[in-house]
Amino acid sequence: GLFGEAYTDPMLEAYTTLGYFAGLTEKAYLGVLVTGVIYRHPAVLLKMVNTLDVLSGGRAYLGIGAAWYEAEAIGYGIPYPSTTDRFEQLEDNLRLAKALWASDETAFEGKHFSAPAITNNPRPLSQPHPRLMVGGTGPKKTLRMVAQYADACNIGEWVGAENMQKALDALKEHCAALGRDYDTVEKTSLSTVHLTGNDTVDSTLRRIKELSAMGFTHAIFNMPDVYKIT
């Protein structure tokens, strides 16, 4: 896997786990980086996020992406469409989220999904809706969808500083083309920190400062060995 794990390694289903965390926490925001669009029916996914938002008192966000782990999908018997189809499914999900969260009920017609009457009751508590975060660096499709639909982007540090900057530049161009204020998009990064390995608090702080200088406003770290810290 991307973070060194195979899909066969022990892991919990994300949204079930987040529902548990909603009852244990009071301030933490709860979401997935990121939800692959192929794994859940779009209307069911939005119902899950709405439910999480209500149960957590308005602390849910929807992190979403076009999915990439073909072996996992095949292993679970889930169809793994072409890249074009997955990105079209991503846009269907984003369009549906914007439409459903703006009303109590909506009909939807997309390229890969349609439904005559999807209800949004109870409404999410987040105002105006749970935050939408799109993960990825694709300059033509992904970042255009960020500019058009999302509240935040998420860019992995593993692509390197130069490509991270290129992604932000592409996002800025899409915002200009769509008439959106670039500053209204939250720029988030994702990386892994091993505080029991080669990483230190000081080196991590230096990375955060470098990300801030590039224009990122929120640094998110995966800490797989945090339980080893004593």
Predicted regions, residues:
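Active-site-adjacent structural elements that line small-molecule/cofactor binding pockets in enzymes
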Residues: 1-230
